């Protein structure tokens, strides 16, 4: 009886796990770290290294490094393809939906605009993303207090940084980074004249904070208070 010929093509080979494939799997599973977090992680690892002979110091350093790695994580996001969508600029929970005048330092007048506020706990990713595609026409920082970011007064009293973005059709959306009780450092990489695509990372607030998004007049939010948001993906509203 004739034997079936042995297949010599590559499809019969046993699958192998190459170093390149393993590295790709790790990168797809573990999100990258925002550059602002690297000094904090390095400090934790340094404590663990210096005190490696002492269990408490080693564990404390490793725990701090791991916590900072989680806090400063920068996970990839896929913005919606729907035209005119305004997405959440931050991960967190919607704490306020109301109307309010935009920050005075932007010189946009006193007329109230629809506003959606997102509270970020220390467990949320703290990178901020552009809510719409457009050009940055104003960036204004205003010093202030460091009260609890979940209180209504935080928007007016706390330190904040406002980024005003003008879309291609002329509509304007304002994203305001608000410092909190623990968050005492606002990082903003956006500058006047920058062109941002929806979902682009433009900043970060360290250790708990709040994000206020001021929408164009006539915009109707499609989210509710208490809803969790994913930065760059959750749709807050549609441009009018």
Curated annotation (Swiss-Prot):
Q: Where does it sit, as one GO cellular component term?
A: plasma membrane
Name where it mostly resides.
membrane
Residues where Pyruvic acid (Ser) occurs?
A: 209
Q: Which GO terms describe its biological process?
A: phosphatidylethanolamine biosynthetic process
Membrane topology type: Peripheral membrane protein
InterPro entries xrefs: PS_Dcarbxylase, PSD-A
Q: How does it assemble?
A: Heterodimer of a large membrane-associated beta subunit and a small pyruvoyl-containing alpha subunit.
Q: What is this protein called?
A: Phosphatidylserine decarboxylase proenzyme
Protein species of origin: Mycobacterium ulcerans (strain Agy99)
